[in-house]
Amino acid sequence: MMKIKTAFGIAASVALALPAMAYAAADQEAAMKDSNNWAHPRGQHNNQGYSALAQINKGNIKNLKMAWTFATGVNRGHEGSPVVVGNMMYIVTAFPNNVYALDLNDNQKIVWSYFPKQDPSVQAVLCCDNVTRGLGFGDGKIYLQQNDGLLVALDAKDGKKVWEVKNTDPKVGATNTNAPHVIKDKVLTGCSGAEFGVRCFIAAYNAKDGSLAWKAYSTGPDAETLHDANTNKDNPLYNALSVYQDVNGGNKEGGSFKRLSADQIKGGEKELGTRTWLKPQAIKDGWQHGGGSVWGWWPYDARTNLVYYGAGNPSVWNPDVRPGDNKWSMTVTARDLDTGVAKWAMQMTPHDEWDYDGVNEVILFDKAGKTYAWHHDRNGFAYTWNANTGSLIAAEKVHPFVNWANNVDLKTGVPDKLAAASTHQDYNAKGICPAALGTKDQQPAAYSPKTGLMYSPLNHVCMTYEPVESKYVAGQPWVGATLTMFAGPDGVMGGFAAYDPMTNKKVWYNKEKFSAWSGALTTASNIVFYGTLDRWFKAVDAQTGKELWKFQVGSGAIGNAFTYGNKGKQYVGILSGIGGWAGVAMNLGMTTDTDALGAAGGYKELTKYNAAPGGGALNVFSL
């Protein structure tokens, strides 16, 4: 651990200590050593969403007041958070992804701005609202991943374009919503488009000039998924051709899948990114349009040089027309940063039948001399792995209402699916929990090294799910399912909870009327901040969950809470501007229950709390 002094005299521990800095993003590493900055999309490379700042505490939080606001001039969903380095704050908006640089020492004056010229038609290809999830900083540059696929490097001082590279092509349905992640001499970015039959990937570009360093696809041959002979060496059962036995025809109506035990599974198989896509597929060689979107928040451990991320759902949502386990969709992977080669990869929802997108963030934490990787998956289970080997330590339901599977085998990582929850073409499966947007969607959880707990926003939403026939056409939606959504058995649509990451047992739980769609922030004063769809910005006690403070902002808050220090004062903030999957139907005036992939019906009451479309704004508070 490195000990630093903040401007407030706090001794701050920077977890996952780094070796000597001799690479492009040395300025980013230096900035992250000072807790007054927020130089990474989640604060630090470990993705914890934690700050050592503690000026705002339980004793004085009642005095927290609005310090300043900034209207972005753009409507609809504002996710992610700004980047703060020294006296400069950098903000990106929803489409068209305008960037503003504000001087915190000069009344938040706009020092420079950048306005991308994007084709408005790109908006029609964005799956779940016009969102983007933040900016990257390093090597004297601000990195912008535009919705239209352009990755752009801007000079942090004046906003002038340094380089740009085309990462995805909206003409075939491939877009971007992720924040670029700057790590050492590379900029990592991903790909969205599983609802358009896009074969997605994670890519690393050289920070200096934008040249491609490596690209790893979510599906396909080992040479293209960057799996080698040593991938999953510590857990060969993760490399299995099949982990289920078909029951009553498997993919046929009335069929289901029985989990194989560890001694029944043959591990150590190769070329699984093609061989687990069995015939007949909806389209020849289905893996070539296999989805596996990558757009979350990706941690990095300099001690092992591993970067971690989740890949999303397979295309198409109709499971009957893509038999097989469909690797490596629905998978958390650890890759070598320099080469992209996978050290380990575990598929969480083999042969997905519910769109339980596996893209959610991974969080790294240390305990008793070991490093662990934690992930709250949309499928309703929280997973804890040995971060170096990929061995599964714990996997538990985050809430009792999860009813598609009983449990997860810790030896194989395979869930025990329930036959009653299987979905089939032209059959309307009812009462499945969670809904396709999962027990948690894009909203990242946070970890506190002070309490040793994870803090997670929650969706408590169930669904009906009916797969339907759908033909692939490049650049057109390719979903293949009809959904409706409704509140879970708790009678609410969301919540916020604390978990012990070594067991994934719940410590405390607060109900929320709607899904908590905002990313969480933890601080050294044992306070947790998050936002809600009914416009509240809240602070709760990290140890008990007791509400300490709240303020109602102008639109639903789906951004990530963040904090920074300036001139001896701590500030905490959040972006508001309702949207995302939960809010897109309201923004577009959709009223049929099945619109917006079921969100229109499930979230119809949002119109009682929000004007549409939601106006984007940054809300900043201090004592």
Regions found by a protein language model. Give the residues of each.
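Beta-propeller domains
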Residues: 260-266, 270-382, 386-391, 396-400, ...
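Blade-level signature of beta-propeller repeat domains, shared across WD40, Kelch, NHL, RCC1
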Residues: 562-623
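Short loop/turn segments that connect beta-strands within beta-propeller blades
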Residues: 103-107, 155-158, 206-209, 337-339, ...
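Aromatic (tryptophan-biased) beta-strands that constitute blades/sheets of beta-rich domains
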Residues: 25-72, 109-124, 160-169, 211-220, ...
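Repeat-solenoid scaffold signature
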Residues: 175-212, 219, 353-408, 421-433, ...
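Repeat-blade elements of multi-bladed beta-propeller folds
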Residues: 38-42, 77-98, 124-150, 175-199, ...
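N-terminal cofactor/phosphate-binding cores enriched in small/glycine residues
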Residues: 44-168, 523
